[in-house]
Design a protein with these regions (language model features):
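Mature extracytoplasmic/periplasmic domains
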Residues: 289, 294-355
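Early extracytoplasmic/lumenal segment of secretory-pathway proteins
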Residues: 38-101
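Ligand-binding pocket segment of bilobal, Venus flytrap-like solute-binding proteins
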Residues: 184-276
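Sec/Tat signal peptide C-region and signal peptidase I cleavage site
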Residues: 33-37
Length: 381
């Protein structure tokens, strides 16, 4: 009996030792196995500038975890890039800002062998952009658009009557109209690079003038803007979307897709706010926002994967349908909602396109003069 008990005890101890040894071995093997780090990507984009599920789709398809941050002006992005070590792998500057940042050595060239969808790009558009980026070495277009006037139909009519010049820059550049529109609120983009060329064009100058006298304090364009300054309610490059949609302002000089988003939000809210977007008859600027990779990016392969993903016709079509901005992928147009593909405020017709002008890069001296002017103007000096 005792022998049996002793044998049973020995067997139990042996099994216990075996289990402990197995656990130690298993732990050792687990510890020895390399842990695969999650692939990551840091993406810095404009606010309200991507479809709701674009990033989630990319993460699901690739297994890459995306950290997505937003900005609302080129100046904010530029400050981060020029300071260095921004931490971002993919950013979206406007083409003119991209051009001067290329000169500063901020970006690395794209590896086009990793971009199988490069063939989908609008080649005439790429030719235009090559003037800012030789051989299109550094960037590809994400979305593009125009700068125009968004206005609350009823409020503008109330302040100015039936004959309000809503099809002209006169609406916002003539003090006699602006003095009245101040009652319902006027918003301007917070960007000298966007607004000053429009003022130059309005007074009959080259919107891309290289003449320093056109940027002097007493120049025609500068005085035009100073004369309307008392009537501008706010300078901001994103808040005007909701402010216009909610009826908090009645006029916004802003970007086409933003104003169309405001229109859509007002319709969804059924709040009685009716908004229109107009490309003024005098013409306006057209701009391109680019996908580029900073020189100090840590995850360049993943950045290329996202660029390639965003050039897929089905993906970029979903983005255009959501943000109301046109894209540079012709094959996507058949996938767009009818209200977008047929809307000449989004995809301008030939007659309107003829009045559009791309912006060029300023010289450092003109940049400095513009920055100083804009600071003075905003503070009312």
């Amino acid at each position: 009996m005792n022998d049996k008990k002793e044998a049973k005890k020995m067997k139990k101890n042996l099994l216990s030792q075996i289990k402990k040894s197995a656990a130690v071995v298993a732990f050792g093997l687990t510890a020895a196995l390399p842990t695969q780090a999650q692939e990551t990507l840091n993406f810095y984009n404009w606010s309200d500038y991507i479809a709701e599920d674009t990033i989630a789709k990319f993460e699901k398809e690739t297994g890459i975890k995306v950290t997505y941050d937003v900005f609302d002006s080129n100046e904010v992005l530029e400050a981060k890039l020029l300071a260095g070590r921004s931490g971002y792998d993919l950013v979206v500057p406007s083409a003119t800002f991209m051009a001067r940042q290329i000169q500063a050595g901020v970006f690395q060239p794209l590896d086009k062998s990793k971009l199988s969808n490069y063939k989908e790009l609008d080649m005439p558009m790429m030719k235009t952009l090559s003037a800012l980026d030789a051989d299109n070495a550094h960037g590809v277009p994400y979305l593009w658009g125009t700068t125009g006037i968004g206005y609350n139909i009823d409020q503008v009519k109330k302040e100015l009557g039936e004959d309000a010049p809503t099809d002209s820059w006169e609406l916002v550049f003539n003090p006699k109209y602006m003095e009245k529109l101040k009652n319902c609120g006027v918003s301007f983009l917070d960007s000298a690079d966007e607004i000053y060329p429009l003022a130059l064009a309005y007074v009959g100058k080259n919107p891309n003038s290289k003449d320093k006298s056109d940027y002097a304090k007493k120049s025609e364009a500068a005085m035009l803007l100073k004369n309307i300054r008392p009537y501008i309610t706010q300078f901001h490059s994103s808040q005007y979307i909701n402010n216009l949609a909610n009826g908090d302002i009645c006029v916004a000089v802003g970007w086409s897709g933003d104003i169309l988003q405001a229109m859509d939000r007002a319709d969804e809210a059924e709040n009685g706010v009716s908004i229109e977007y107009t490309i003024p008859k005098e013409g306006t600027s057209m701009w391109f926002d680019m996908l580029v990779i900073p020189k100090d990016a840590k995850n360049t392969d993943n950045a290329h994967k996202l660029v390639n993903f965003l050039m897929r016709p089905d993906i970029i079509a979903e983005i255009t349908n959501y943000v109301w901005y046109p894209n540079g992928i012709p094959a996507s147009k058949t996938m767009l909602d009818e209200e977008i593909s047929s809307n000449t405020s989004i995809y301008p017709d030939a007659a309107t396109k003829a009045k559009l002008f791309p912006l060029s890069v300023h010289t450092p001296k003109i940049d400095k003069a513009l920055t100083r002017f804009w600071t003075d103007m905003k503070t009312g000096r």
